[in-house]
């Protein structure tokens, strides 16, 4: 029996570990990682027609319309859908078994557009909510360091003064202050709760305790997914460590 491609959407507050868990899931389950932020930056840097339209909004300090962001994400999802269909028709073997999306949707309007698409091509899709306390977010973000070259994220407990990959001196984000972080948490809650309520009503929401260590969070996510939908592939668990297991590391994004 053919296994339905796995499609996950990962959501959570700043510092909840979305980036780390997305990398772990993509690596260990052979999922394509789709980041809406990366799609936006790539479109602008490549000066595509859509990128030019996005840049015009950003240059004016305006919020991007739901339909514009959806158009960008939809292009990528359509590529994924076409690839999945091709595999079914021609029995081609590809490394990806599905995809994980982060950074989208941010509004109920976006969620409805996405749901209409996914119900047609990935009907068993799930939303992974990384639920984390305000105190833990504050603790993580005030102790994180970033590589200005590769954008790798490390925490103070790891003891690095330089990026182990680039050998560039690590820096702090200027907005990683308690006051700004608390404001970002409140903004996240106000913007995201309606989206979470929408997905909860569709019975697609899986809530995971993200206060736990990275390794435990990852294992809890796997436990919450139907085993028939994935196969673990032992690879390097994320970009900031070289282990060949799926125990993860202590960095958080």
Curated annotation (Swiss-Prot):
Chain positions recorded as AMP binding sites: 36, 41, 62-64, 103-106, 110, 173, 184
GO biological process, one term: AMP salvage
Binding, ATP: 15-20, 144, 153-154, 212
Entry keywords, A to Z: ATP-binding, Cytoplasm, Kinase, Metal-binding, Nucleotide biosynthesis, Nucleotide-binding, Transferase, Zinc
GO CC annotation terms, alphabetical: cytoplasm
Reactions mediated catalytically: AMP + ATP = 2 ADP
Annotated EC: 2.7.4.3
NMP as annotated region, ranges: 35-64
Pathway participation: Purine metabolism; AMP biosynthesis via salvage pathway; AMP from ADP: step 1/1
Keyword match Nucleus: no
InterPro entries, alphabetized: Adenyl_kin_sub, Adenylat/UMP-CMP_kin, Adenylat_kinase_CS, P-loop_NTPase
Superkingdom classification of source: Bacteria
Protein purpose: Catalyzes the reversible transfer of the terminal phosphate group between ATP and AMP. Plays an important role in cellular energy homeostasis and in adenine nucleotide metabolism.
Domain comment, as recorded: Consists of three domains, a large central CORE domain and two small peripheral domains, NMPbind and LID, which undergo movements during catalysis. The LID domain closes over the site of phosphoryl transfer upon ATP binding. Assembling and dissambling the active center during each catalytic cycle provides an effective means to prevent ATP hydrolysis. Some bacteria have evolved a zinc-coordinating structure that stabilizes the LID domain.
Subunit structure: Monomer.
Name this polypeptide is given: Adenylate kinase
